[in-house]
């Protein structure tokens, strides 16, 4: 299968340039996040159809916030592509987070030294 190696950034996190509906989008990879989440600006830029209701209650470090639901036609990291991916949209946050709903679709993922390795 496909393997993608992502180097650890100087901030100690793993950042990746993914394609959402074919458009480049920078994500923080966060195995502590259940769902992949983007900010409203990103959702608009990549053409996500976002639900009107913000009916997803999500617990964050700042308490519980409401988010809207969307689906990406495609979400691609390196050569690993997934279709019809559920994404939460945060109204006031511009941090894009690649969460477990993407990571758990992989055959395997691991951190080895300063590398995150994704295997499809």
Summary of predicted features, one role per range:
Residues 1-120:
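Pepsin/retropepsin-fold aspartyl endopeptidases
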């Amino acid at each position: 299968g496909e393997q993608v190696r992502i180097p650890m950034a100087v901030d100690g996190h793993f950042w990746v340039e993914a394609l959402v509906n074919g458009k480049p989008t920078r994500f923080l990879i966060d195995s502590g996040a259940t769902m992949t989440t983007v900010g409203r600006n990103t959702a608009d830029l990549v053409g996500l159809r976002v639900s009107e209701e913000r009916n997803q209650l999500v617990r964050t470090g700042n308490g519980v916030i409401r988010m809207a639901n969307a689906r990406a036609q495609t979400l691609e990291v390196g050569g690993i592509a997934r279709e019809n991916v559920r994404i939460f949209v945060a109204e006031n946050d511009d941090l894009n987070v690649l969460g477990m709903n993407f990571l758990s679709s992989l055959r395997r993922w691991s951190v080895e030294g300063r590398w995150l390795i994704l295997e499809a």
